[in-house]
Amino acid sequence: MNLESTATSAEYWSDLADALNTPMMKQFLAIKKDFPDTILFFRMGDFYEMFLEDAKIASSILDIALTKRQNAVPMCGIPYHSKDNYISRLLNAGKKIAICEQSKPEEAGSKLMTRDVVRIITPGTVIEENLLSGFQNNYLAVLHLKKSLIYFAIADFSTGEVFYSSVSVTGLERLIAELEKFKPSEICVPKSEHTFFQELEYFKNREFTVLKNQIETSEKDSFQVLSKYLNEYIRETYRDNKLVLREPKILSSGKFLEMDRETIRNLELVENEKEKNNTLYSIFNFCNTAKGKRLLKQRILFPECDPVVLYSRWEKQDILLKTVLAPYITALKDFGDLERILTRFRGNHAYPRDFRSLLNSISSGIKLKEELEKVSYPFLIPIEELKKISDFIQERLHPGDDLPVILGNGIFLKKGFSQKLDQAREAGVKGKDWILDLETKEKKRTGLNTLKIRYNKIVGYFIEISRAQAEQAPKDYLKKQTLVGSERFTMPKLEEIERTILEADEIIQEIERTEFNRMVEEVLKFSSSLLSFSEEIGDLDFQISLLTAKDKFGWIRPKLSEDRSLDLSDSRHPVVEATLPPGQEFIPNSVYLDTQDKAIAVLTGPNMAGKSTFMRQIALNQILFQIGAFVPAKSAKLPIVDKLFTRIGAGDNLTAGESTFFVEMKETANILNHYTEDSLILFDEVGRGTSTYDGMSIAWSILEYLSSLSVRPKTIFATHYHELTELSRLGGIFNLYLETLEKEDRVLFLRKVKVGKAKKSFGIYVAKIAGVPEPIVKRAAELLTDLESKKKEIKIQEAQPTLFTEPETKNFNSQTEESILKLKLEEMTPIEALKTLEDFQKKLRKQK
C-alpha cells in the first residue's frame, strides 16, 4: 500500500468536503441538484463559473483552463458578455446549458446573492439570434408510441413552426425518412417509451432527451398528447410559457413526394457527405431573405403531389416573367427574419434593433405591395395592420440604425417622445460634463498630475491618485478604496454629481424598459398578420429565386404529363452542369418512360461513362418539376410521381454488423415493398455485392417481376450484367447504353445515351487509367481473352438454351426427358432454373 498516496487522497477529500461546505457552494449544489443533466452557468459578477464535473466537461470542450477553488473544487469560467460563443460550442457537442443569474443579496448585509436558473438552452430549443443560422431551421422532434402507431412532432421553436404525422411501428422507414429531412438537433421521448425507441436500429447511436413528466394519454387525439409534451418542454426550458407555437401542419401521406433516406442522401438535395455546397439547394438558392432560404429548402425536401399547387406557382411565375426583377430583389434585401423576431419577443429575448428590422421590413413590404399590384401579382399582405404597427413604432423609436444591441447601452426612444425622459438625458449629459469640469479643477487645485475621475459599476464614481502622490490628497477627500498602485477617494461635490447622474440613468432605464415592454406587447397583438406577411415574403423570394436560376442556367418550364409518361429531351444534371469548370459543357441526354411498353430501361455501359449521373439527373429534373421550378432540358413533359426511390451505391453498416450486400438488399427490399404504379425507381448495380451468378439471378428476377405487372413503375436499371439485356424480349423492358469510342489503345466516354446495349464494360481500361500496375493490367487482358473464348466455346459446344426456350431433347434419355417435361418453369426463379440445368449437365456428362 502506498501510504503517501493514501494520505494525499484523504487530504484531498477532506479539503473538498470543506470547500463544498461554504455558503456559495451549498447554493451551487442545491441548484445543480435540480438540473443534473445540464452544465450549470453559475453567474458570479462578470463571469459564469462552472464547478466540479461541469467544469471538467466544459474545460475540455471549450479548451479553457481548469483551476481549483480553495485547492479542491475544480472550476472554470467565461466572461458573461461573450457567453454565446461558448454556449454554441457546447450545444454543438450535444450539451445542455442552464443559465443561472444573480439578482440581489439574499438578505440585508449578506454577501451571498440570490441566484435562479432563468433559461435552459438545449440543442433543439435555441431561439437566441447569435446561436442560430439565419437560413437554417433548428428542429426538435418529439416521438410518442401509442399501440401500433408512432406519433411524431417536429417543431422549430425559433420560428414557431410545427409538423405532425404518424407511422405504423412496422413502417419505420417513413419516420426515418422524415427525420432525415428535418435533421432535428434534439429528439425527445417520454420516459416510459425510452427503452422502445433506444432499441430501434436507427436510434442506437442517438442521445435522447427523456421527458420526465408523463402526459396522460387518454386523449383520443394523440396529436394533442404531442402538443402537451411540446408545451411542457417549453415551460421547462424557457422557465415560463410565453413561447407560443403555431398551428401544426399535418404531413399526410400522398400530399408530398415521398423519398426515403437513401434517396435524399444519394441525390444530395441539401447536403452531401463532404459539405453543404454542390447540392441542388446550393446551386439554385438565390433567395435574399432568411424565410425564403428556409422555404426553398423545405420545398426541395417536400415536393408537391398536387397539380393545383404547381399551376398556382407557375401562374405567379408567369406574372413575374413579364416584369423586371431587380427592384423586387433590392426590396427583399431589407427584410428581417420576422418569424424569429416574433419568437424573441415572446421569449423575452428581443433586441432594440429588432424594432428597426421590423420597420424596414414593413416599409419594403408596402412598397412591394404597390409595385406588385400594378402587374396583378397576388401579394396578399395585411396592409392596414402593418401600417398600424409601423406608425406605433415610429412614434417611439429613435431614428437611425445605431440602436443599441442591448437595452440600456444606448438611445432607444426618440427625442420628444417623453418630456421626463428628455430631461433625464439632459441631466445625465450635464452631469458627465460636470465630472470632466470637476477633474480639471481638482487637478489644478491639488497640483496632482496623476489625478483622474473614473467610474465602475461596483465602486461608482471615484477620484484615483497614484500611491506616490496619495499622501498629498486634500483633507476634504474621503478614502474609498486602496489598490496596489493607487488610492481611490470621493468628495461631497463628486457624490452630489454622481447622485444626479445615477438618478437620471435610473429614470432613463425605467422609462425605456417600460416602453420597450409595451412595444413588444403591442407588436405581439399583430402576430398573425406579421406571420402572414412573412409567408408572403418567403413565397415571393422563393419564386424570384426560381426565375433567377432559370435565367442563369437556361432552364425551361416543364409541362404536366396527362398519360403518366416521363419525356425529357436533352436533359442535364443541374448540379454537375452548374459546377463544371469554365469552357466545359455538359452533354445532354434524352429519355422516355411510360407505364407499359417503355416502363423499364436496362442501362449498360462502362464505369465512368455516366450511368449514375444520367439516373440522378432524371430524378433531380423530376424533383424540380414537383416544386414548381424550371428544369435543365430542351423540353420536358413529366408526370406527378408519388414516390421516388434510388438504389445508388452502398457501403458497409459496420455498427449494425451489416455487409455491403446486406445493406444493398435491404434498400432493394424497401423499394420493392413500397413502390406504386406512380413511382419512379432508379436501380444502380443491383447484385454486385455478391457472386456473379447470385447477383445476376437477383437482378434478373427483379426485372422479370417488374415486367410481369399490368401497370409498371417507371424504372431505370443500370447494370454491368450484359446478360440482362436479353430481357428486352419481355414486356415493358427496353435497352439503353452509354456510347463509347475505341481509338487505338484508348477509350473515349462520349456520355451519350443511346437505344441498345453496350458491347463491352472496358473495366481493364478503367483499371489502367486508374494507375493499376502495367503487368497486372496486361495479365488481366490475357485472362479476359481466355475467359471470353471459353465462354464462346461453351455456348457452341453445349448450345445451352436460355431460360425462356425449351431445351433440345434428342440426346436425352427418356427419364431425363420426362423430368424436363414435368418442370413448371413459370414457377421457378432464375437461380432454381440454373441449378436444375446444372444437374442435367452432370447427368449427361456421366452418361457420356
UniProtKB/Swiss-Prot annotation:
GO molecular function: ATP binding; ATP-dependent DNA damage sensor activity; damaged DNA binding; mismatched DNA binding
PANTHER family in alphabetical order: DNA MISMATCH REPAIR PROTEIN MSH1, MITOCHONDRIAL, DNA MISMATCH REPAIR PROTEIN MUTS FAMILY MEMBER
A GO CC term attached to the entry: cytosol
Binding site for ATP: 605-612
One of the protein's GO biological processes: mismatch repair
Job description of the protein: This protein is involved in the repair of mismatches in DNA. It is possible that it carries out the mismatch recognition step. This protein has a weak ATPase activity.
Family: Belongs to the DNA mismatch repair MutS family.
Keyword presence, Nucleotide-binding: yes
InterPro entries: DNA_mismatch_repair_MutS, DNA_mismatch_repair_MutS-lik_N, DNA_mismatch_repair_MutS/MSH, DNA_mismatch_repair_MutS_C, DNA_mismatch_repair_MutS_clamp, DNA_mismatch_repair_MutS_core, DNA_mismatch_repair_MutS_N, DNA_mismatch_repair_MutS_sf
Record Pfam families: MutS_I, MutS_II, MutS_III, MutS_IV, MutS_V
Protein name (record): DNA mismatch repair protein MutS
Record key words, sorted: ATP-binding, DNA damage, DNA repair, DNA-binding, Nucleotide-binding
